[in-house]
């Protein structure tokens, strides 16, 4: 790879806004580009983040892309929890796996997925991204709980499990949203 390409790949902001593809509201492929709201979140990210209920601003999409990027380029362990198994499968298939499959072949070849199963990508260099309805055990650098308010209201036992399991897997200095 050329030095100028390596320099670009070292820039997380550039990678996020140039490497990854998503589908737009009409289902058409489009390159992921942060919206002003997503940029504000990205630039102000803290180790513990709360995103108030905001429909159609693309925060879950952005977090999926951030986690995929971290798993690929930082060998980070990442997890995304959805409130139902169907939503977890859909998020994995439509956000994570779609973006991964559309990456340039050179990027995938440099750190191939050794486990590419429904709900999980595990990369040769140690990073991983797990999408399910819960997480327990291990240590995470990134955790995103989608629809946590809904989980708390509809599934209080699952919410307690997330608080005592998944949140505890995210150590100080790592990121939970």
Describe every region a protein language model picked out.
Residues 1-177:
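Phosphate/NTP-binding elements of NTP-utilizing enzymes
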